């Protein structure tokens, strides 16, 4: 099982979480609480360029954070999605619901 490394960075009007490794039921505890706390205060960007695994539990965290963001007037952005993560998100049928960006300059 590959571990998930999470690097936090503050932007002007967002919190960036760079994710690297497997984002799954075993590793989501490393980031889920941080995402949920941050989304109440500011926009959140998940940099998923280096995500090597994404399972249903992790997608559930992303969807819940997306819904929380809408309720609080904030936005959750998915940045530079890896091929593996993209494949898994596409399989849910909800890809069009997410705010997918190529650069943090797109955060509005």
Locations of the language-model features?
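STAS-like cytosolic regulatory interaction modules
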Residues: 1-53, 64-108
